Design a protein with these regions (language model features):
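Accessory, non-catalytic peripheral segments of nucleic-acid enzymes
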Residues: 81-174
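Functional cores that coordinate and move charged inorganic groups
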Residues: 1-95
C-alpha cells in the first residue's frame, strides 16, 4: 500500500525506496483497484482492476502490459479492458431550463458517456440536483421519474441507471 490511500487502510506498509533496494525491475502491487504508476526505476505499479465492480470504482479500467526487450523492461502500456464503466453523474435542474427531467438527465448521461468506446456501457448513479422548490416538485413523483429516466436512457442507448437520488444542490460557502 506504499504510503497508503485515502480510500484504503494501510495493510502492507512499505516505501518505493524499500522496493528499489531489492534490485527487482518491476513491482506489481495488488489489492488497490485504481491503476497508479508510483515509480519507473524500478517500475512500481498498482495495475488496478480490469473491471469496476460498482459505482465506488468509477471510470475506465485496464490491465498493464509489460513489454520486454533484451531481458529488460522496455515499456509499460495501459490496455483498456472494462466493458462496463461506472460513474456518478449529476443532472442539474434549474428554473431557467424548461426541459423535463428525463431530457436533462439524458444530456448529463450522454456527456458522461462521450469518452467511452463503442464496446463500453455506462452504468450511472444519477444525482438530481437543483434549487429546493424544483427538487421538491420532482421528489413528490420520484418513482415515476426514476422509471422514466431509466426508460429514456435505455431507449437512447445512453447506458444503464444504477440508482437515481434526489438531493438539494450544495449550499454556498458562508
Amino acid at each position: 500500500s506504499l504510503a497508503g490511500s485515502a480510500a484504503h487502510d494501510v495493510y502492507a506498509p512499505c516505501a518505493v525506496a524499500d522496493l528499489a533496494a531489492r534490485g527487482y525491475d518491476y513491482w506489481a502491487l495488488g489489492h488497490v483497484h485504481g491503476r497508479t504508476v508510483h515509480a519507473e526505476a524500478p517500475w512500481v505499479v498498482m495495475p488496478g482492476a480490469p473491471q469496476g465492480r460498482h459505482v465506488n470504482e468509477p471510470g475506465p479500467r485496464s490491465a498493464t502490459e509489460i513489454r520486454v526487450a533484451d531481458g529488460r523492461i522496455a515499456a509499460l502500456a495501459e490496455i483498456p479492458t472494462a466493458t462496463v464503466v461506472f460513474e456518478r453523474v449529476e443532472a442539474r435542474l434549474s428554473a431557467e431550463d424548461a426541459a423535463p427531467l428525463d431530457a436533462v438527465a439524458l444530456r448529463a448521461l450522454e456527456a458522461a458517456a462521450a469518452g467511452l468506446g463503442p464496446e463500453q456501457t455506462l452504468v450511472a448513479r444519477l444525482a438530481v440536483t437543483g434549487d429546493a422548490a424544483t427538487l421538491a416538485a420532482h421528489r413528490r413523483h420520484a418513482d415515476y421519474w426514476r422509471a422514466r429516466i431509466a426508460e429514456t436512457a435505455a431507449e437512447a442507448g445512453a447506458g444503464w441507471i444504477e440508482r437515481v437520488d434526489f438531493a438539494p444542490a450544495a449550499r454556498p460557502a458562508a
